[in-house]
Amino acid sequence: FEITNSTFGVVEGISGVGKTTLLNLIAGLKKPMSGEIILNNKILSNDYEFVLPENRNIGYVFQDFALFPHINVKKNILFASKNKNSDFYLKVIKKLNLESHLQKMPHELSGGLMQRVAICRALLMEPSLLILDEPFSNLDYENSINVQSILKEYISENKIPCLIVSHNTNLFNEFSELMRIELR
């Protein structure tokens, strides 16, 4: 399949069918047994050494958030940020309602807050591809709608593709540039 800029690709399928494995292959966390993975005309699947997603300029929000447990929220967010003092940084933190949580440690956060921190970190990387594995699973309805709005705006403004695994695919019905990928 091919996903173009400013498009949301929603990967659907029953549990255990390989949705997360597909994301890990694209992100470079697993090596494909066959085929090619191409991002911005570069064949990523030819990289035989393990390459972290951020080194491929891929923003990846994992199911389990992958926050660093021994540093605070602000340092977690800034870990891969390209513009640590920019207006963009402040705008994203404010939109995700994280201002009052910057000095907290990850273990002090709810699942929904950890999810928003992980999404914030991925956006501040300014990636050429955004991969989100169950980005709404720990969010209440209001925060899900807020994050959805932020993602739509970010993807549209930055003209990058976004690949999402989500069991709540109804959230994407109003997206204008939507591609559904069903794994069986």
Label the predicted regions.
Residues I119:
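Hydrophobic anchor residue at the start of the ABC signature
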Residues M105-L109, L113-Q115:
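Conserved ABC ATPase signature
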Residues L44-G59:
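ABC ATPase NBD coupling module
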Residues A27:
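Helix-to-loop junction immediately C-terminal to a conserved catalytic motif
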Residues G35-N46:
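Conserved ABC transporter NBD signature motif
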Residues L130-E134:
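Catalytic Walker B motif of ABC-type/P-loop ATPase nucleotide-binding domains
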Residues L124-S128:
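A short, proline-enriched helix->beta-strand linker immediately N-terminal to the Walker B motif
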